[in-house]
Every structure is written in C-alpha cells, then in structure tokens.
Curated annotation (Swiss-Prot):
Annotated compartments: Cytoplasm
GO BP annotation list: protein quality control for misfolded or incompletely synthesized proteins
Name of the protein in its database record: ATP-dependent Clp protease proteolytic subunit
Gene for this chain: clpP
Function field: Cleaves peptides in various proteins in a process that requires ATP hydrolysis. Has a chymotrypsin-like activity. Plays a major role in the degradation of misfolded proteins.
Keywords: Cytoplasm, Hydrolase, Protease, Serine protease
Amino acid sequence: MQRFTDFYASMHGGASVTPTGLGYIPMVIEQSGRGERAYDIYSRLLRERLIFLVGPVNDNTANLIVAQLLFLESENPDKDISLYINSPGGSVYAGMAIYDTMQFVKPDVSTLCTGLAASMGAFLLAAGKKGKRFTLPNSRIMIHQPSGGAQGQASDIQIQAREILDLRERLNRILAENTGQPVERIAVDTERDNFMSAEDAVSYGLVDKVLASRSEG
C-alpha cells in the first residue's frame, strides 16, 4: 500500500498546504491501482484548483497562497483558480503579496466569501476577476482603513505615520478601481469599520453576485 499525506506538500519543500491553526484536518483516502493515497482535505481540493484563505492574513498565509497560485498557473495557465475567503484580515504587506500575485498570474482568479471577509480579507475578495467575485448569502464583509501602532523616537513615529498614510492612499485607490466607487467615497467609508451584508457588498461593488447554491455560479 502506498500512502501519501499532503499531495502537493513537495512544492512547499515538504510543508503542508493546509491553513494553520485549524485543529483537526479531515483526510481523504483515494483508491488507485498503486494502492491508497491519503490527502488532507485542502491538498485534495487544490487538485480541483481551489485555494483557501482561512484565518488571519500573515506572512505564512501569503507564502502558501502565492505558491499555490503560481503552481496552479504552471499546471494550466488557461483554467480559472478559485480563492475561498473566510478571514478577519491581517498584515497589509502580506495581503499585498497575495493581491499582486493574483493580478500577475495568467488564470482568472475567482473569489468567494464564506463567512467573513474583513479588512485585507475584503480587499482580496474585491481583487478577484470582475464578474467572478461572489459571496454566500449570510457572509459579512467589512472594510476599514489600515491600522498600526507606532513607538520609538519622534522621528521613528513620523516615518511610520508617513508609511501608514501612504498605504491607506494606495489601498483606497485600488479599492476604488475594483469597486467603481470614487476614491473620495472609499476614504470616507473606510474611516471606521464598515460592515456590509452580502447584498450591500454587491451594491457597493465589492462582489458581483450572491450565490445561494453552486448552480447559480
């Protein structure tokens, strides 16, 4: 019997593609002429070109998602990739690495919110290919301005303040392009946490359609 865990682990230097911090991960066992193959559920779904952004956006998350995007592009540059998002957000820098790679790869990247897409999670949700950005009916989407804590000498705080203001301007400009909203409205609407229902997110331009069933996609 031949048994494998993490079918695509080798492309990460032996590391799993499974999102971290999820506790018990179901395994899928497939029978073949060579015996049994066991995959964690996320590695199995990667074969179907499904990538999951689950939990906070951080360097580890970004590295895994970027690697999976590039791998799926190399597998088939003409077939769509689906990115499922259930994330409270996190690092702007890590999120921008994912965003840039989504735009860089040749396949269209379709996005789907399952639960919550907040902060950088919402930013990445809106970054999917226009016409292919979806949300489930009871999901929540939240946008706001970037936040950060500054400490140190006055000159250090000034440098960090300039950086976060530059990031806010950049994020607002990209969000305006992806939603069709004026950048002035984006600036106002992201001043504080701005929660939206699935229908509100469609009206705002963050997503294109609410999906109640797979047949509607």
